[in-house]
């Protein structure tokens, strides 16, 4: 009788030990099982179950985290759905490379204003940003990692005194 109770206690202890694994659910449907070490501003640092090395995932790639010990569910980010060019306003520009960790790199894109235009420095910048976001939306990518932001004004631009804004980035998706 004592052996049966001991075996039952060991089996229950094993199940409880396994149940304390944190589960990270990504927006693309993948789940990652391990131990969340910490949640930073743009990233989540975790260790895979049975490993000691720390891994990093950007928060934009993560839907939620279910903590194994407490059972608490933490919603990290909502999924951004960009299906047509009309969804360009939903596109997010990332300025920190670590925020793109865990997302799939798509292609390099560019948005710019014309050489001769009637934009001020600020409105030209907004126009270039809009074109950049529209390019990302056209290929179905909700994120852009900004790689270059160049503005030329006056005689350095085109010799005609106009201004031109050029923004380049890498488009990312889930």
Range-by-range predicted roles:
Residues 1-21:
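Bacterial Sec-dependent N-terminal signal peptides
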């Amino acid at each position: 009788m004592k052996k049966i109770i001991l075996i039952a206690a060991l089996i229950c202890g094993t199940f409880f030990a396994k149940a304390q694994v944190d589960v990270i659910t990504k927006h693309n449907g993948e789940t990652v099982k391990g131990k969340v070490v910490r949640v930073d501003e743009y990233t989540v640092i975790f260790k895979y179950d049975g490993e000691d090395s720390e891994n990093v995932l950007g928060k934009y790639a993560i839907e939620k985290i279910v903590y194994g010990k407490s059972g608490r569910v933490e919603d990290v980010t909502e999924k951004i759905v960009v299906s047509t060019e009309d969804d360009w306003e939903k596109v997010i520009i990332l300025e920190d490379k670590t925020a793109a960790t865990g997302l799939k790199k798509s292609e390099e894109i560019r948005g710019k204003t014309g050489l001769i235009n009637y934009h001020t420095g600020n409105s030209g910048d907004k126009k270039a940003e809009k074109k950049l976001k529209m390019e990302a939306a056209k290929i179905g990518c909700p994120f852009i990692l900004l790689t270059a932001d160049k503005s030329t004004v006056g005689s350095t631009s085109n010799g005609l005194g106009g201004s031109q804004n050029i923004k380049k980035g890498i488009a990312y998706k889930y």
